[in-house]
Amino acid sequence: MPRPILVRAAIVALLVAAALSPPTAAGSIRAGRLGIGDSVMLGAKDELHARDFGVVDAVVSRQFYDAPARVQHWKRLGRLPKNVVIHLGNNGIVRASDCSHAVQAAGIHRHVFLVTLKVPRSWRILDNRRLRFCARRFANAHLIDWYANSRDHPGWFARDGYHLTASGQTAYASLVARRIAAVP
């Protein structure tokens, strides 16, 4: 028969583990949508959650080269949903190989949505070309053309030209949700 102290220790360990688990992790399975991004996506986090994103895995200054590892992380946890949205590249270049590896890491039974950039930086044009190419290259990859949909709406952006205002957050999340809904 287990000692009462060991039983209490086991219960405490379970409670601590439950408290430390990310509260939205289980939601990723239920909602079927995961966002991987940088500060732009992070700014729209609440709007994305309102549109059934279980997890918005976005941090300030994240680079596109982090995308394959983030996809693999959620896959290893068994929490990679059917729809994965990747919006990275605002902080540096998108390499074609990183884009390919991110899509391949998701697997052929998941949809990967690549979001184009609206950032006033020298690499934007080339990054958007690479994102378009990557979306065309894989049957399960799809493009969300944020650049084309947002370039004529300066009110959607803060002074820096790419972080989102409240109306920009709403427009961004709406576009992403509509594009996901359009894919069978």
What is the role of each PLM region?
Residues 34-36, 113, 142-144:
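Hydrophobic/aromatic beta-strand patches that form the interior of the parallel beta-sheet core
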Residues 57-59, 115, 144-149:
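Conserved beta-strand termini and adjacent loop/short-helix elements that scaffold enzyme active sites
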